[in-house]
UniProtKB/Swiss-Prot annotation:
Highest taxon above the source species: Viruses
Record protein name field: Non-structural protein 3b
Task performed by this protein: Induces host cell G0/G1 arrest and apoptosis.
Keyword Kinase: no
Native organism: Bat coronavirus HKU5 (BtCoV)
Disulfide bridge partners, by residue number: none
Keyword Membrane carried by entry: no
Single GO molecular function: RNA binding
Amino acid sequence: MDYVSLLNQVWQKQVNSSQEGTLAPVRPTYAYRPVQGNLQCPIKWRCIYTFAGYTGTATEPTKVLAKQEAARKVCLRLQEYGRLDGFGLRLRYSTAFEHNRYDASKSYFYTQTSSSSHE
């Protein structure tokens, strides 16, 4: 799960737990703006990501990277104030996949079996 998905999960849990007749929490919002980059990447993207009163801003070469980095900053702020308790973030490079291998020709992770050779 990435940072954007984590914040969407937090929002969905808030929506599901809100009482009928009350205002639902505002969903995470984001906006992009092109900014001047450098010689290697002439145009970069600035993303402003807002959720639960916190805002994260990031400038990266792609929109996806900018959105993830901005969402990460919001997650860090929420974590500081204990608002992410009960939620877990597992990234592909975390220790959860320590013994798994990734085959670039496939779009999924697979676990090494006993018949596979050890690398």
